[in-house]
Amino acid sequence: MGSNSSPPTVLQLCYENVTGSCVKTPYSPGSRVILYAVFGFGAVLAVFGNLMVMISILHFKQLHSPTNFLIASLACADFGVGISVMPFSMVRSIESCWYFGRSFCTFHTCCDVAFCYSSLFHLSFISIDRYIAVTDPLVYPTKFTVSVSGICIGVSWILPLVYSGAVFYTGVYDDGLEELSSALNCVGGCQVVVNQNWVLIDFLSFLIPTLVMIILYGNIFLVARQQAKKIENIGSKTESSSESYKARVARRERKAAKTLGITVVAFMISWLPYSIDSLVDAFMGFITPAYIYEICVWCAYYNSAMNPLIYALFYPWFKKAIKVIMSGQVFKNSSATMNLFSEQI
């Protein structure tokens, strides 16, 4: 008599014949190809897009300004995500296994957190920079100098690196969750379980600077509207050369603030789902399905690839710089002093 029972499902492991190996839950071949293409494209764009930003700002002397140095340093953080975080997370997300060892798992997690906070710090300082530039454009050059920008860059790197290293290399992040962490700590896994205290600290560390940036940019656009009305009034009268100069400077700073404001909004939208999900998981017993978690993670990662696209859309100088770099003209001795702006202010 034939049996109607189906054959037992073969359990796939990350490491066959290894005791304590994690269970592998692979996608179908078609899905894997699509996911590798999508995630790989994000990583490539993050690496090469941000590399273009760094080369443009550091090579062309016309772009050597306090704001642009902050943008170049922000691009460096996003470049770090693209080259040291996204490729390995891509394999982990698609294969559902970590094949790079326990030590590199810790290093990878540190880089992930450090680059995220570095981006947040850079954007916070850029918001302050834009606030001063728009509210007081003529005094701004004496307030936000290259030296001040250098200090901001130093803080934006040192604090996140020290914080992430101290948290993940000392093991304080899973205090009170040792049993759960041990249960998830199978061979081929890189699952970091963070306790409620550190998740709350992380969430507040994201929320407070975000609220400050929202307030600053809200004030920036209120001031910008007032300045626009003044410029209209000046335009309807006989304007002096001094008033004309002030109007052009104010217009330039508002345009820069708008572009960088879009960058800040993109960061908030990208990272907010992950921040909320982490908070909910910590206080609700890690209830988020794996696929929801992966979507939140990759929305955050993709932010590192978005900034160069934003600059390309709103900064004519960046598009011109890319053409010079890609055409090989950048290797000419005179390229560093090339004019990238269509109009001078």
From Swiss-Prot:
GO molecular function, one term: trace-amine receptor activity
UniProt family annotation: Belongs to the G-protein coupled receptor 1 family.
Keyword Glycoprotein: yes
Region (Extracellular Loop 2 (ECL2)): 174-187
Membrane topology reported for the UniProt record: Multi-pass membrane protein
Extracellular side: 1-32, 90-107, 169-202, 277-282
Disruption phenotype: Mice lacking Taar2, Taar3, Taar4, Taar5, Taar6, Taar7a, Taar7b, Taar7d, Taar7e, Taar7f, Taar8a, Taar8b, Taar8c and Taar9 show no visible phenotype or behavioral deficits. They however show an absence of aversion to low concentrations of amines such as 2-phenylethylamine, isopentylamine, N-methylpiperidine and cadaverine.
Protein location: Cell membrane
PANTHER family attached to this UniProt entry: HISTAMINE RECEPTOR-RELATED G-PROTEIN COUPLED RECEPTOR, TRACE AMINE-ASSOCIATED RECEPTOR 6
Cysteines engaged in disulfide bonds, as pairs: C22-C186, C105-C190
Keywords associated with the record: Cell membrane, Disulfide bond, G-protein coupled receptor, Glycoprotein, Membrane, Receptor, Transducer, Transmembrane, Transmembrane helix
Transmembrane segments: 33-53, 69-89, 108-128, 148-168, 203-223, 260-276, 283-302
CDD domains: 7tmA_TAAR6_8_9
Protein function: Olfactory receptor specific for trace amines, such as beta-phenylethylamine (beta-PEA). Trace amine compounds are enriched in animal body fluids and act on trace amine-associated receptors (TAARs) to elicit both intraspecific and interspecific innate behaviors. Beta-PEA-binding causes a conformation change that triggers signaling via G(s)-class of G alpha proteins (GNAL or GNAS).
Domain notes: In addition to the well known disulfide bond common to G-protein coupled receptor 1 family, trace amine-associated receptors (TAARs) contain an unique disulfide bond (Cys-22-Cys-186) connecting the N-terminus to the extracellular Loop 2 (ECL2), which is required for agonist-induced receptor activation.
Free-text tissue specificity from the UniProt record: Specifically expressed in neurons of the olfactory epithelium, to discrete glomeruli predominantly localized to a confined bulb region. Present in a ventral area of the main olfactory epithelium.
Topological domain spans for side Cytoplasmic: 54-68, 129-147, 224-259, 303-345
List of glycosylated residues: N17
GO BP field: adenylate cyclase-activating G protein-coupled receptor signaling pathway
GO cellular component: plasma membrane
Protein's name in the database: Trace amine-associated receptor 6
